[in-house]
Every structure is written in C-alpha cells, then in structure tokens.
Amino acid sequence: MSDLEDSILPPLKWLFDQNPPIPENIRDWLMESGSMTLRLKKYCTCFQVQRQRECFIMRDKLKEEAEHLPKSARYWLREVILMGDNKPWLLGRTVIPQETLLHNQSLMHLGTTPLGHYLFNNDKLTRDYIHIGQQGVLWARRSRLRLRDKPLLLTELFLPDSPLYLHHK
C-alpha cells in the first residue's frame, strides 16, 4: 500500500446500543478477554501471520482512532492478516503511541509472531474496553489495551472464513 491513509481495514460501524442484536456465539468470540491468537489456533493445524504494513505514522493518519489514544509525536502501526490453514481469518490493525514503546521495544520487531504471544505473556497487560462493530455482515472488535499502564489500540475484523462464523452459518 503506497498511501499511508489506506488501511487493510475497511470503514467499520461501531455498535454502542447492541442494535442489531448480537448472537450469543458471536458475542462470546467478540468479548474474548484472553488471547484471540490462542483461540483461533484451536481451529487449524497451520497458523500464520502475514504482515501487511509496519511503520511509524503521524496522528493525522489515525482518523477516529485518535480519540482513543493520547497525543504522541508518532505512532507505530502494524497491520496483519491472520491465516488459518492458508485461509484469511482476521485483519488486525494495532496503533501504538511512541511512549508505549519506551519499555516495549519488542512490539516493533514482532515479525511474523502474533501480537497476542507478546501481549498475553506479559503480566503488565490490562484491557480498558472492547467495542463491537460491523462491516456489512462481518463482525469486528476494538480494544484499548495497556502495557505497564501505557495504551495501545487493537482493531480486529473477522473475515468470512473465520471460525467465529462456524456455528452461525
């Protein structure tokens, strides 16, 4: 992607009033408080992270994400596709203020390691909230997490082949 304003994530509609109603099995996935990576891995024999973009961006490129993060000189952006048995399951976008990276430099060097492996093996991780959203018929979620009390924003869009939809088709 040549234009930094482009994202692998399409525009998402955030649902704050639970309308439309969220099926219970879908809600269970979207409200997962543990590692989504570990949950997804239970449904495949081959799990991969395909990196799409990793770079620093300025605040003006964040759009509405800026409302969820403190002002920073710049932000680390990581966009990936999580694959299960060679099928795209999830689009992930992580935005990390530079200050969060001070004690978490490894976040810039994950390569094909899932973000969840780093986050959920860290005893200094907390979650402020999970917002549920949609893009057409696809479900999404956005979480503000904190490492050592420093925020990062993770947005995940569950693609059609994702196991989230297995019992809902």
From Swiss-Prot:
GO MF annotation, one: chorismate lyase activity
Biological process terms in GO annotation: pyruvate biosynthetic process; ubiquinone biosynthetic process
Key words, A-Z: Cytoplasm, Lyase, Pyruvate, Ubiquinone biosynthesis
Catalytic activity: chorismate = 4-hydroxybenzoate + pyruvate
Positions annotated to bind substrate: M36, R78, L115, E156
Assigned protein family: Belongs to the UbiC family.
Protein's name in the database: Probable chorismate pyruvate-lyase
Top-level enzyme category: lyase
